[in-house]
Amino acid sequence: MQLSDLNKYCDKALESYATHAQPIYPGTVVTAPWVRLKCQYGCGGYGKRYGCPPDTPTPEQTQAVIDCYQRAILFHIESIPGSKEKGGRRVLKFFDMLVDLEGEMFKDGYYKALLFLAGPCHLCKECAKGKGEPCLHGDRARPAMEAVGIDVYQTVRNNGFFIETLKEKGDPKNLYALMLVD
């Protein structure tokens, strides 16, 4: 199987909201135990949403899943605070498009297509987990790369994409999503 077989899906993402999309080898995806600790100590969403730790796979489980794949796609979107995005709606539409793309890839025969997004889930204003109820959007909810222990910074850099820590609140954000394919 060729990485180039995935170009049509990259093109679809680029036609929608993606800034960049590139087929990659899963061996370039880095997992590490410290990543999950950054969620636990530093993110207010820890334990409050089904898409956040501790309700997500561990880095070790994630690495075992990644090892089952030969190809993947890395997607990038630049989010500029204060732009015409109206509170990040463009980013949310991007994530929604990627979930649809995952379904399309499944229908095209990529039955192992598996998507990881960025940041905490925002499908509901208030996650049903807080009420002890099941996820209301289990068909569309996807965990973030960082929530499953993927070192987004190193993974992105391994594949020639740009990323750096934010220096100021108003700095452009570079958000990434990962689709494991086969």
Q: Language-model segments: what does each one mean?
A:
Residues L3-L6, H20-Q22, T28-R49, P54-D182:
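Catalytic cores of enzyme domains
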